[in-house]
UniProtKB/Swiss-Prot annotation:
Organism of derivation: Phytophthora infestans
SMART domains referenced in this protein's UniProt entry, alphabetically: UBQ (SM00213)
Family: Belongs to the ubiquitin family.
Domain Ubiquitin-like: start-end pairs: 1-76, 77-152, 153-228
Protein's name according to its UniProt entry: Polyubiquitin
Glycyl lysine isopeptide (Lys-Gly) (interchain with G-Cter in ubiquitin) crosslink residues: K6, K11, K27, K29, K33, K48, K63
Note: For the sake of clarity sequence features are annotated only for the first chain, and are not repeated for each of the following chains.
Gene3D superfamilies documented for this protein: Phosphatidylinositol 3-kinase Catalytic Subunit, Chain A, domain 1 (3.10.20.90)
GO CC field: cytoplasm; nucleus
Role summary: Ubiquitin exists either covalently attached to another protein, or free (unanchored). When covalently bound, it is conjugated to target proteins via an isopeptide bond either as a monomer (monoubiquitin), a polymer linked via different Lys residues of the ubiquitin (polyubiquitin chains) or a linear polymer linked via the initiator Met of the ubiquitin (linear polyubiquitin chains).
Cellular compartments annotated: Cytoplasm; Nucleus
InterPro entries linked to this entry: Ubiquitin-like_dom (IPR000626), Ubiquitin-like_domsf (IPR029071), Ubiquitin_CS (IPR019954), Ubiquitin_dom (IPR019956), Ubiquitin_ubiquitin-like (IPR050158)
Classification lineage: Eukaryota, Sar, Stramenopiles, Oomycota, Peronosporales
Keyword Transit peptide found: no
């Protein structure tokens, strides 16, 4: 059958293909016609980026369908995402991609909704609005994917200045862990933080559930003076 490939310059290329042709194979045909190396090609159909190992029929691409060819910037790179089951997913990304964007790509590959994904790199949980380059994530870096349990919840932390911080936590998170999240958001070292809930100072080794801290609970953050106890 014939399909069309439209480039960003508006040029349309016609290709002779079989439904069983793989995406790599199609990229090879584009290279033969246009001289563009496959690793610089990104093919889009119905808003989805096509993965090399899949076939045209996998994506329901039929005769006279039109694919869109986007050139991968030299900054394009691959990163790896390792799940708790030990499976490793490979993603094609740009340094400028946001974390939301990466979660969307994981959903496209694995079917996991972004709101159930927590991505960790170098021990830090990655925030949706930030980009890969913000976290200095470079080519062939490995991120860790932790599934947010249905028990995932939000809590609030109120500072002495009256500011309220929202945190995504699990009931099983330790107090140290919560202090780490506060440091990630606010830059306050954990050893300067004292967290108070229901009039009690929270101990590092305990968990939120130990203190019966539930969703939308409010903790109070008091700064520990240097040299204070």
């Amino acid at each position: 059958m014939q399909i069309f490939v439209k480039t960003l310059t508006g040029k349309t290329i016609t290709l002779d293909v079989e439904p069983s042709d793989s995406i790599d194979n199609v990229k090879q045909k584009i290279q033969d016609k246009e001289g563009i190396p496959p690793d610089q090609q990104r093919l889009i159909f119905a808003g989805k980026q096509l993965e090399d190992g899949r076939t045209l029929s996998d994506y329901n691409i039929q005769k006279e369908s039109t694919l869109h060819l986007v050139l991968r910037l030299r900054g394009g790179m691959q990163i790896f995402v390792k799940t708790l089951t030990g499976k490793t997913i490979t993603l094609d990304v740009e340094p400028s991609d946001s974390i939301d964007n990466v979660k969307q790509k994981i959903q496209d590959k694995e079917g996991i909704p972004p709101d159930q994904q927590r991505l960790i790199f170098a021990g830090k949980q990655l925030e949706d609005g930030r980009t890969l380059s913000d976290y200095n994530i470079q080519k062939e870096s490995t991120l860790h994917l932790v599934l947010r349990l249905r028990g995932g919840m939000q809590i609030f932390v109120k500072t002495l200045t009256g500011k309220t911080i929202t945190l995504d936590v699990e009931p099983s998170d330790s107090i140290d862990n919560v202090k780490q999240k506060i440091q990630d958001k606010e830059g306050i070292p954990p050893d300067q933080q004292r967290l108070i809930f229901a009039g009690k100072q929270l101990e590092d080794g305990r968990t939120l559930s130990d203190y019966n801290i539930q969703k939308e609970s409010t903790l109070h953050l008091v700064l520990r003076l240097r040299g204070g106890n």
